[in-house]
Amino acid sequence: SKLIWAAAGPARRRLGTELSGPAADLPALPAGFGPVRMAGPGMLALGGPRHTLERNCPDPCMEALTRALEAWPGREAFPLLVVADDADFCAAHLDNFLWVTFTRSDPATDVYGVKAAIQAKHWSCEAPLLVDARQKPFHAPPLEEDPAVVRRVEALAAPGGPLHNLL
């Protein structure tokens, strides 16, 4: 599946850069959601409950989350909210945020939004748009570094090694 996020024209909002003021007044979230972390201007990572549904099934807990966020006074400042298994990892670095968001989500089933609507076959929502980027049961297991392999590669990249200045 593919998602096109088209934007044109003058800025519509000022992106949030910290969870303070109205943005800090998050409503009570459904069970299993939290903590929330800043991932970048206008972007939040939110921890979510373990995903247990089959492929291509909309998640009722994500729908409940969108309803809860309707009353959030800071939502216009954060138009993108990514639900992840580990919000701290997701928000720690932009690389992590991009990896988690775009390798663990399917636009056909994992994109939600506050007051989502379809008009003339075009999907729309109010802020925030939510991406369900939790690890799904049907995903391949995450890649984990093997410390022995890491040491061998680092040795190859050391001064005098064949991969020096390449890694």
Which residues make up each language-model segment?
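Charged, compositionally biased interaction regions
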Residues: 1-167
